[in-house]
């Protein structure tokens, strides 16, 4: 099965694959060439997801600017 390009994957799908890659690399039973391929794939997935997060943040900022009347509140995770 051919791998999807990271930019064509959903965020959650890429996270799942990235977690699997990390698990395989942590076990340490891959040949060097395979480990490098997995590492390269992981970097591509991480970069793609970072771009998706930045785009989502920009969309949130635009929406918040459009609704300037809505007051911003501090986030409290307690």
Swiss-Prot record:
Quaternary structure, from the entry: Heterooligomer composed of large and small subunits.
Name of a matching Pfam family: Exonuc_VII_S
What is the name of the protein in this document?
Answer: Exodeoxyribonuclease 7 small subunit
Main location class: cytoplasm
What is the organism of origin for this protein?
A: Psychromonas ingrahamii (strain DSM 17664 / CCUG 51855 / 37)
What the entry lists under InterPro entries is as follows: Exonuc_VII_S, Exonuc_VII_ssu_sf
Taxonomy of the source species: Bacteria, Pseudomonadati, Pseudomonadota, Gammaproteobacteria, Alteromonadales
> Keywords in UniProt for this one?
Cytoplasm, Exonuclease, Hydrolase, Nuclease
Q: Which reaction does it catalyse?
A: Exonucleolytic cleavage in either 5'- to 3'- or 3'- to 5'-direction to yield nucleoside 5'-phosphates
Q: Name one GO biological process term.
A: DNA catabolic process
Family, similarity comment? Belongs to the XseB family.
